[in-house]
Amino acid sequence: MEELKGYLEKSRSKQQHFLYPLLFQEYIYALAHDHGLNVNGSFFYEPAEISGYDKKFSSLLAKRLITRMYQQNYLINSVNDSNQNRFVGHNRNFYSQMISEGFAVIVEIXFSLRLVSSLEEKKEIPKSQNLRSIHSIFPFFEDKLSHLNCVSDILIPYPVHLEILVQILQCWIQDVPSLHLLRFFFHEYHNWNNLITPKKSNYYGFSKENPRLFLFLYNSYVVECESILVFLRKQSSYLRSTSSGTFLERAHFYEKIEQHLVVLCCNDFQKTLWLFKDPFMHYVRYQGKSILASKGTHLLMKKWKSYFVNFWQCHFHFWSQPCRIHINQFSNFSFYFLGYLSSVPINPSAVKSQMLENSFLVDTATKKFETIVPIIPMIGALSKAKFCNVSGNPISKPVWADLSDSDIIDRFGRTCRNLSHYYSGSSKKQSLYRIKYILRLSCARTLARKHKSTVRAFLQRLGSEFLEEFFTEEEKALSLILPRISYPLHKLYRERIWYLDIIRINDLVNHL
C-alpha cells in the first residue's frame, strides 16, 4: 500500500499554486484566439473555434473585460437580474467564452511544460504528427488482437455533477481563486439553463459554448479513471513498460480509494495482484470509448468489469450501469471503434497432406483482424447530412444549389475523398463503393436541380467521364505514394492501407 501511495502522489512538488493572476494579462486572451499558433508547429495547443465571436475579438474588448473584472461588485450581482449584471445579460456568452478560453490556455500551460520535461527525460521528442495520428491504432490491433480471446467494450461514463471535474483539477492545481472561478462558470450555466430550459443538461450548454475548457476538464477526468489502471498494469506486468501518461499526480487520490482497495486486497496488495495479472492485457481508448482485450479467461474479464463499476462508485461517487461494459469472445463479436466495425473471426480451412501412399485432410483455423465500413450507420450519417434519404437513395442537397458548378463539384469531391481516405483500411470495399455512389449521384442531382434539368439528361450532356475523380482519386494518390509497386493499382486498392496523417475522426464518421 505504501508503494501505491507513493505512486499516486508522484510529483506533488510540481503542482501549480498561482495561476489566477494570469487571467488579468491581456496577452492570454490574444493567445487563446490566435489560430495561427497551430500552423507554427505547436502540438500542445489546439485552437477551439467559436462561431460568431472570433471576428468580434479585439484587444480593446479584452481591456474592457479586465477592467470590469476589477470591480468589486461585478461578479457577485444576482444572476437573476440581467439588467444589472451584464455578465449574464446579452453579452453573457461573449464574456464567459473569453474568460473560459483564457482560463483553458492558463491551465494547459502547466501540463504542456510537464509533457516537455517528460519528453526531454526520454531524450527523444517524437514528431507531432506521430503523436496525433489516430489510424496508428489499427496496425496495433492487427498485430495484437488476433492472439487474444476476450474483449471488453467499455463506455466511460460522464460524471453526474460538474463539481467532480473541479475536484479532479484540484489535485493538480492548488490555486483557490482559479477553482472558484471555474465553479462560478458552472453555477452560471446551471442557473441560466434552468431559467430557459429547466430539463436541459448542464453538460450540453457548457460543452457547446466552451468546448476547449470542457474537453480539458473531461480529459482530466479520463486520466483520473485510467491512472489506477496504469498502476495495476505496471505492477502486474512481467516487463515493466513505460507509461505514456505523464499527468498522474494525485494529492488526495490514495485516501479516496483506500477503502475500496482494502476490500480487494485484504490488507496485502502484492499477494492479490494475481486477480488482475495478465501479461497479454491491452487497453486502447479514443474519446469516451475504450477497448480492454485479454488472452485470459472470461472470469478475469468479469473481475475487471466489477472493478471498474466499484471504482467509479467509490472514487467518483456515482453509480455506473454495468451494462456499459460488454464482455465477449473475439470469435463471435464485432465492436465499433473509430468509425470501423472490427472483428477477429475464425477462418477454418482444410489442408491436404500427402505421406507416401496415404493422404489425409488437416483442419486448421486462423484468426485475422477484419475492419469493415458499417454501412447502415453510415447511411444514417449521410441521411443526417442530407446526401440521401434513410433508405440510402441519393437526393439533392438544396443548400449547395446556389453555389457555382465548380464549387458544388469541389465540395462533393472533397467529402468523397475524405471518406475514402479515412476508410482506406477497410477489409471489404463494397460499402465504400456504395458511399461513393451515393455522393456521386447526389452531386448530379444537385447540379440537375440547379440547372432545372433531369439527372439522365444532365449526365448524357456531360458524358460518362463526369465526376470520374470520385473513383480514381484514391488510385492517383496511391500511385504517387507507392510508385514502385509492380502489381496493378486495382489490386493494391483492394488492400488495407492505414494513413498516419489522420489526426481526427471524420465529421460524418463522428455521427456513428
Swiss-Prot record:
Chaperone is among the record's keywords: no
Pfam families: Intron_maturas2, MatK_N
Keyword annotations from UniProtKB, A to Z: Chloroplast, mRNA processing, Plastid, RNA-binding, tRNA processing
GO cellular component: chloroplast
InterPro entries: Domain_X, Maturase_MatK, Maturase_MatK_N
Primary localization class, coarse: plastid
GO molecular function, one term: RNA binding
Compartment(s) where it occurs, according to its Swiss-Prot or TrEMBL record: Plastid, Chloroplast
Record bears the keyword tRNA processing: yes
Residues annotated as signal peptide: none
One example of a Gene Ontology biological process annotation: RNA splicing
Top-level taxon of origin: Eukaryota
Family indicated by similarity: Belongs to the intron maturase 2 family. MatK subfamily.
Chain's role: Usually encoded in the trnK tRNA gene intron. Probably assists in splicing its own and other chloroplast group II introns.
Protein name per its UniProtKB record: Maturase K
